[in-house]
Every structure is written in C-alpha cells, then in structure tokens.
From Swiss-Prot:
Expressed at high levels in liver and kidney and at a low level in stomach. Barely detectable in lung, heart, spleen and brain. The lineage of its organism: Eukaryota, Metazoa, Chordata, Craniata, Vertebrata. Exhibits lysophospholipase, transacylase, PAF acetylhydrolase and asparaginase activities. Can catalyze three types of transacylation reactions: (1) acyl transfer from 1-acyl-sn-glycero-3-phosphocholine (1-acyl-GPC) to the sn-1(3) positions of glycerol and 2-acylglycerol (sn-1 to -1(3) transfer), (2) acyl transfer from 1-acyl-GPC to the sn-2 positions of 1-acyl-GPC, 1-acyl-sn-glycero-3-phosphoethanolamine (1-acyl-GPE), and other lysophospholipids (sn-1 to -2 transfer) and (3) acyl transfer from 2-acyl-GPC to the sn-1 position of 2-acyl-GPC and 2-acyl-GPE (sn-2 to -1 transfer). It comes from the Eukaryota. The gene is Aspg. One of its GO terms (biological process) is lipid catabolic process. This is 60 kDa lysophospholipase. The modification Phosphoserine is found at residue 478. Residues 41-350 are annotated as: Asparaginase. GO terms for molecular function: 1-alkyl-2-acetylglycerophosphocholine esterase activity; acyltransferase activity, transferring groups other than amino-acyl groups; asparaginase activity; lysophospholipase activity. It catalyses: a 1-acyl-sn-glycero-3-phosphocholine + H2O = sn-glycerol 3-phosphocholine + a fatty acid + H(+); L-asparagine + H2O = L-aspartate + NH4(+); a 1-O-alkyl-2-acetyl-sn-glycero-3-phosphocholine + H2O = a 1-O-alkyl-sn-glycero-3-phosphocholine + acetate + H(+); 1-hexadecanoyl-sn-glycero-3-phosphocholine + H2O = sn-glycerol 3-phosphocholine + hexadecanoate + H(+).
Amino acid sequence: MARATGPEQRLLAIYTGGTIGMRSEGGVLVPGRGLAAVLRTLHMLHDEEYARAHSLPEDTLVLPPASSDQRIIYKVLECQPLFDSSDMTITEWVQIAQTIERHYTQYQGFVVIHGTDTMAFAASVLSFMLENLQKPVILTGAQVPIHELWSDGRENLLGALLMAGQYVIPEVCLFFQNQLFRGNRTTKVDARRFAAFCSPNLPPLATVGADVTINRELVRKASWKSHLVVHSNMEPDVGLLRLYPGIPASLVRTFLQPPLKGVVMETFGSGNGPTKPDLIQELRAAAERGLIIVNCTHCLQGAVTSDYAPGMAMAGAGIISGFDMTSEAALAKLSYVLGQPGLSLSDRKKLLAKDLRGEMTLPTTDDLLGDDMLGCRATWLLSMNGSQDADAMKDVLLPGLALAAAHAGDLDTLQAFVELGRDLNLKDYSGQTPLHVAARRGHASVVAMLLQKGVDVDACNEDGQSPLLLAVRGRHQSVIRLLRAAGAHLSPQELEDVGTELCRLASRADSEGLRAWWQAGADLGQPDYDGHCALQVAEAAGNADVVALLQSLEDRVSAQPQPH
C-alpha cells in the first residue's frame, strides 16, 4: 500500500441515497436530491475559491488542501432515482459496479454514498463483483442527515474522501466514525449511535485521529497484471436461515425448496445446530440435490469449527463451513459463486471454501494442532464406520488434518490416513499438500514417507510454489536432496528472479541459502536485474568465505545432483 501521488487526485462520489442526504417532509425523512449543492455550502467539504479559480463544473467539488502539494477533487454523480437502502437489491448494486467500471480510468478512487441499513450487504456484494481492484472503493453514509446541526455525515464523507484520495487501498471498504473497515468484514451493530458499524473478526484497515494509522499488513495487494473485472451475473435465489432451539424440520424443509439455490445458515456458537435426525436428514437431502448450504455462526465474533459433535454432524450433512465470515459476506459470496457460469457443484464448493476477497480467515495448521485436537480428531475419524455420513465427514476434515500431521512431523497419523485409503496428494484451500508443509518445516522423515507413497513431487500451491522451493527457502538440505532424488525441479517461474535472490544472499554472506539454491539445481551464475551475479556481489562486498564457496560450487557443477 502506498500514498497517492500527484498534485491532484480525482475521485467520483456516487450518491445512491440514504439518510445522509434526506430531508424532513411531513415529519418523516424522505430522499433529498441535489447533494452536490448542499456540499458546496460546507467549507470542510468544498473550497469555493479554488473551484472558481480553476473553473470547476457545478457537480465537481474540491476539498480544502489536505497537504501543501495535493488537492482532492471529486465529482458527485447522483443516481436517478435515489434509493432507500432498504429497497436495495442485487440489481441496484450491479448498477453501482457498472458505474465504477464505466468511469474506472477517469478517477483515482471512488466513494459510494449509501444508506446505512444495507451498507454492509452492499460492501460485501461489491467486493465480489469488483475483481482485480487497483483503486479504493469506499462506502459511507450517515445516521443523521448532513444538513442537520448535529450530524455524523460531514465527518464520514470527509474521511472517506481523504482515505480514497490520499492512500492506494485497492479494496472495497467502509468508512464510518473515523474507522476504515474492509467492506466484506462489516456488519451494522447499532441503529442510532454514530459508531454504527464494526468489523468483528478483523481489525480496521485504518483509524483516523490526530494521525492516520494504517494497518498495512492487513491491506490486500493489488493485482497490477490484471484488469478490473466486473461480475454482474449474481444469483438472486439465495437465502438466509437462522436456526433456533426447537426449529421444526418441516419448516426447514419448506424453506429449502426450489427455486432456492443456496442458503446461509446461521447456527449456534462455533457452528452447532440441533442434531435431531429429521432435521439433519432435511439438510442432507437438500445438499444431495445440489443446494449449497454455508454454515455461519450467529455470534458476532468467532468462527465455525468442528470441535463439537453437533458441528461435526453439520459437516457430515454436506454443509460448508463459513469460518468467520459475516452473514452479509457469506450471502454475497454465495450469490457470486452461484452466478459463475460453467462450474460444477464441486467447483462451486471449493470456491466457497477459499478466501477470495479477504472475507474470511481460514484456520492455520497451528489452529488445527492446538489443544491436542489433532490426535482427537484423527481418532474420531478412524472410529467412524463406512456410512455415507462418515465418508462425507472425512472428505471435509481429512485435508486439514493431513496437513496438520505433516506440520507436526506425525508419521503415525499420516500412516493412519494411508490405511484409510486416502490419497496424500489432497490439497487445502490454498493448494498446499502435506508434502508442501513437510518440506517447509524440514521434516525429512515425513518427506521420505510421502515420496515413498508416490505423492506428486512437483505439485504447486496457488502461489505457484513447489515443495522444493519451500525447502530451499527453509535451507533444509536433507529435504532438498530427497526431493531432487525423487525428480523434483524448480519451474521456470520459480527461477524467474533467482539472479536477484542469489545476489541478495551473497550480499548478506548467507552461505546456507546459496548452497540450498545450488543443491536445488539453480544456476549460481544467473545475473540480477542490473547484470551482476552472486560471485561479483560477494567480491565487491569483500565476503571472502562466500567467494570461496561460490567458486567451489561452480567447480563442482558437473557433480550437481540431477533429477532422475
């Protein structure tokens, strides 16, 4: 993430309606047109002197100088007609996304002025509609109309404009009460207070006070090699079902009927629900006929797990874990995935289990290892009979448990998985196999066992990384030798910038790192971006030991291990 540069930053503010621009008529608030005219009267949101001097159009405003060398100029585009956010549907959100697409090259960022009641839904939907964002899209609004004496609208709009104009945050965000949230992590938590929104399972991306604090490690990186893609084909036939104690199976059966194609089911605690056989049977029957069910906790914080038997039963019924997604994000994601053409049911389920736009935090291997859960879960799996329920449960849980066993170097558990007849090439949401994990951790005995079982030695995860590359980065010499002996090799993509990496290692006198790359088959004479090789860098730095090592390895190039 970087600061926006240039003397002028041009933004498009899309005014869709909402409380921020409403006026009182007959004792009730109604949508108010002409927001740009109202904003022109507010000095904190418009510098009239600058606008006159530069002959800006009536619908184009400019903020007072936020810094001595930069101005934020914004055009207000008012929707025709304005919408009450309670009436917003996918159709209106598609219109917003397409408006952003039409003006994408003209502006450095976008602010969407939206009603608060469905703003979290809108932010979630837009995050999935807008793929490969390279510019900020920030939603904001108000609890009190902007022309009222005591209104939060002025600060919210100003904050959204400043964040969109001063920082390159390539995400759909929501700005409210001095906090910038990832849009698909938000939910509305208060009907009246100005602090109306929260992000229960992810800290704010930025907090505004006397200073602006950016949580840079949380901001997603832009995909500069790809162009903006707007997904307007969203599936409208999705629903939200909240379980409650004693919910009748007949009610659930009625809800799950066609034309419904997907449902977000809010469950108790960490993903639990009633285990009554008739209810589980209705859920299983719906899943078997192709209805996709995503399990989200109705708790504000926390995530869906399978630590308890009721949660296990839900997984066994064919229900997909939503982990820590909000219901708003899960509903939007379901609509997006079901709207993608040409995908099989299995492909759609795999997409739902992946983190696509930063909407959920997937469990790490360490999470699976915590509290001795690995052994308990493996024992539970081994004790299950060969019923359809058991097979479904194993399909859900085995990938994560196999990776956890590889992480822990647990040969016994991995052998138990083999005895279950399971393929150890199975992958998690990020494309990692047990071999990736074992290679990264340096567990040579686990790597040897996996190779003996015939796993794919060159399997790549979603980042294009092979087990060999992970072993090189970890300087695990014994693992590198095992992988090379099994025929592993670094791909052209993995070797693309190897010259720069080798020069970096040489400058730091990192002999082990250089030896690892050589052991993996890399050419130590590869130049970096300016034509220097590792040996030249080591000589220039006066690293005699590194020079001697590199010369020795070059002399032994003919003896370098070759793939079989």
